[in-house]
Amino acid sequence: MKKKVLATLLSMAMVAGVITGCGGAGTQSAADQLAEQGVTEIPAAETTTEAAEATTEAEAPAEAAEIDLSQQVDLVFYVMGDAPQDEELVEAALNEKLLEKCNATVDMQFSTWTDFQQKYANEITAQSADLIYIANWLNYGQLASSGAFEELDDMLDTVAPDLKALVGDANLNMCRVGGKIYAVPNTWAEYVCNGVKYREDLRAKYDLPVPDSLENLEAYLLGIKENEPNQGLLTVTTEESQGLKTGFDAAWALNFKYNWVANNGLDYGLAANYDTPSEVYDYWYSDDFVDDMKLMKKWADLGFWSKSALSDTNNSDAYKNGLCVAEVAGQNPNKQITAIADFENAGQGWESAYVAYGETNGVIYPGHATQNGTAIVRGCKDPERALLVLQAMLCDDEINSIVQYGIKGTHYDVVDGIYKNLQEEAGETPTFPYEGFNTWNLRNGETKLPQKTDVKLQEMFDKYAVLGEKTKFPNVNIYDGFSENYDSYSAERSAVSNVMRQYLAPLEAGLVDDVDAAVEEFRTKMTEAGIDKCREEYTK
């Protein structure tokens, strides 16, 4: 199967050779949810500001245009996750500065981690937010193609030249969809290598292997089960599995086995290896898939997860609270650093360790620019003011510090250049932790305050950089810049997603009686849903 999609990705990788957050809901992505609702294009909304209607004929970056700030604008900023306890207190401090410099305020709205894909889709459809967090794992490219976000090319020159200069053309170009810029990424280069986060203290206590392969992960879990039969092992559900690759969390562990171009393979059960990205092959209809599903059933029968896992909701604090001994889906180095801090604060002698899938399968690269970014929602009440506020939140040191760390002297202090949370230091639960607004999209690499744990994080990044240099395309993410246009097969795509929820999820959860029969039924249902058309169009 000679396919254009990966060849396109490969050319993107060459252009992006200068490359410098997370998750939880059901198998449908936000883009899928919109398609199912019949929304394939987000209509443009009227804007009340004259400045937003103006265009510029400048062909090179210009000085910031004079913007009318006479009227206060109140904006809504939609971000992921849960709100911090001191949300209102920090917002008040933030808005005091934004009113002074932009005559604007922001109301931070949070998705929570329950059904966040559906909530994100609803937010896009309703156009109730002005600024919104975007990421490749939230299908930024597909949503941008549908018209969900404002084009930023001209406004970056006329409204926010400082922001454009800070981010740089290379990063902005990686955010282009159809030749247009629809998002502004953060400026902190990081590795977001997915992997397994696990309890190192229990591994060492019972002399178990590091869970760095399917075989060793199984031995690690079995060893803990035998020694501590009442200890939960994996709190896997359908919630980390999103898009059109997997239906159940546990299947993420299969990344140990394959050196795929992207974690969990490609959409529609296709796959390609990182070293040979133009050679796309069929995974769902392969013998490997059958073998993998038999492994999932073995693990389910061994009691590695609950028999009600398909209907369980995501407990994002399960690992933190000792309810499980490993997490295999949606993990990354930053989540490991958070776990280290959580365990230290808990004071129970727990220790968290991390192994990236790429350490075993040989595929390691830094995060794409669209890993964490900000877009202006189509329908924003004042796009220019929104971009001006975004510039202030990223470029203004005082404002950025409030957004990321809270109020100095109340929530944090800086000692010898290191961030210190004052409540944690006093043995209290932080009411505004580090990056308490979950604004990973507003990380400024030039001014980001390091935490004590950042020493460990940088050690992880340094290790991954060395491993990434040994790959065929050294430290280049050749996949995440790809954007799928599924207008011509949206009905089939939706049907395929439904089959994944109904038939693939139980297979990957091992909650079927006969794997061979269940695989056959899954494949039959996929054919009926139109998988062939999806694959043909996807790989044109």
Label every PLM stretch briefly.
Residues M1-L10:
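Positively charged n-region of N-terminal signal peptides that target proteins for export
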Residues L9-L10, C22-K540:
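Extracytoplasmic/secretory soluble proteins
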Residues G17-G21:
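C-terminal motif of bacterial Sec signal peptides marking the signal peptidase cleavage site
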